Every structure is written in structure tokens, then in C-alpha cells.
Amino acid sequence: MLKQIFAAIILALFYPDASWLNELTSMDHMVEYNKINLSQVGADPEVVKDNATWPLTPTSRTDSGIELPLATFDTKPTHVTNVEELETSYDMCQSVVAQHAAALRTKAMLSAAYNIAPASNSAATPVLPTTGNDRGDGNKALTYADLLTLRTKFNKANYPQTGRVIVLCPEHEEDLLKEDAARYNQIMTTGQVAGFKVYVTNHGVQYSTSGTKQAYGTTNAQPCSFAFCKEEVMRAMGTIDGEPEKRWADYRGWLLGFQMRFVAMPFRNKGIAAIYSKNA
């Protein structure tokens, strides 16, 4: 029973209302044994206008199946002593669980951001450089014009006008605020810019100076903001395991730690984009 209770607490705290992870298409119902089976849909059919030749030549559609194991996220256990639990004026175990939920959420968010940001520039996955003036750190600032360029790329790719999301990095949020504070404040009020719903988070994805996504965890390259169409990205939650383990003989208290299975990624290499800070 404790296992189910603590798993429910972790899950309830994992998707706060302000999190951009809520924008991803939930595929929880497709998870089985901590794996998810997806199909990448084949090419769209050709449309012929005012056809005069019958019958039309049929074409086959080839779909590709993908079996995807969910990533495993483990928190290192926290030791709560019997004395601490008795002498604190709050439920220390519940506080520790909330802390583990926040840590899991942060790590899963970083993984999701890295998976969603495209590897390099293409018509279906635009990766654009910033074009503003030197922001003082040797990089060009993000401008509102850059966001309009991204909008045009999405429009030319015929992506839906609804369900577009952009996740700004802190540097790019600062750039927009400096360029036009009143306009920025209006964006934060409406939550929209250039047709994109706006979020801001320190997601850590970085690119090279030529626009190639760098390895996960890179910290010395170019920061970026990334964007996506909601219908083109997914998230899936698997099992959440963990409960307080009483360890009286050696720890005089409890150990709390959790394991969560989760993945977030694009359905296909389409409908995702990034804007990276270009060298000035």
C-alpha cells in the first residue's frame, strides 16, 4: 500500500501546471512492461487534380515499427533518522518524497528537451542562428525577427497553426526583454509569441557554432531555444517504484529512494526546431 501511495505522490507532483512537459502528447496508455510500441507512418498519398486517366495507379504505404524501452531514472536514497522524524514539526518523509519528485522531474525534463531538439537543420527540422547584436558574451542576441523567421519555416512546412510551442532558454528570454520590455511583458501576459505558446526553462541543450546539436550534458557550447508542434512529440510514463525502507539496525531510521521509467521524444523527425546563439 505504501508503494502505491508514494508512487501517486510522485506522479501528482511530476506535471505541474506551468510545465512544458504538459504540452507533449501523452502515450501512457501505450506503455506495456515499460516499453512502448510505435509506428512511424509512411509517405502521404499523392493527390491528382482533374484526373482523366483511370484507374489511378495504386501505391503502397510502408510503416516502420519501433519498440522503445522507457529510460530509467533513479534517485539516490535519502536517510531520514528516527530522531529527525520525531523532532520535526512537519512530515519529513513527505517532504523528502516531494524533493525526490522535483529531482526526477528536472532530470526527465533535461532528457526530454535533448530528445526533442533536432540534430541539425533541415526543411522539416529548422535549426536557425540568432541574428541580433552582440549580447555582451560574444554571441548574437535572439530577436523578435528570429521568432518570425521560425514561424515562417513552420508555415512553409505546412505545420498546424495551433499547438505550436517554444521553450526559451534563460539567455534568449533576457534578449527579448532587453530588446523591447513592453513587448516582452505582453508576451508573458498572453503566453504567446509569433503563434507559439511560450515557456522558459534552463533545459541545457546546446549546439555547435555551425548548428549541430552537441552531446547530452555539454556545457561549453551554444545555448538554444527549441520549438515543436504538440502533435509531433510524445511523453510516456511507466512504473514508479519506491517506498520508505526501515533500516533500524544500521541506520536507525528509513531510507527513501525512487525509480521511475519515462521517455519523451518526437514521433518522427518532423515538426521540431531550434534557435541557437550564433557567435557575434
Regions from the PLM with identified roles:
Residues V83-K156, A274-A280:
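Alpha-helical scaffold segments that mediate packing/assembly in large oligomeric complexes
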Residues E32, I36-N37, L148, T152-G238:
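Extended oligomerization regions of viral-like shell subunits
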Residues E46-K49, T88, D175-K178, M265-F267:
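Short helix/loop capping segments that flank catalytic or ligand/cofactor-binding pockets
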Residues P223-L255, Q259:
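A structured, mid-to-C-terminal "fold-capping" secondary-structure block
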Residues P244-A280:
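Extended, compositionally biased alpha-helical segments that mediate assembly or anchoring
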Residues N37-S39, P69, P77, V167:
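Short, conserved beta-strand segments within well-ordered enzyme catalytic domains
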Residues T59-A98:
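Long, hydrophobic/aromatic-enriched structural stretches that serve as scaffold segments
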Residues M1-I66, I272, Y276-K278:
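N-terminal "assembly arms/tails" that initiate or stabilize quaternary assembly
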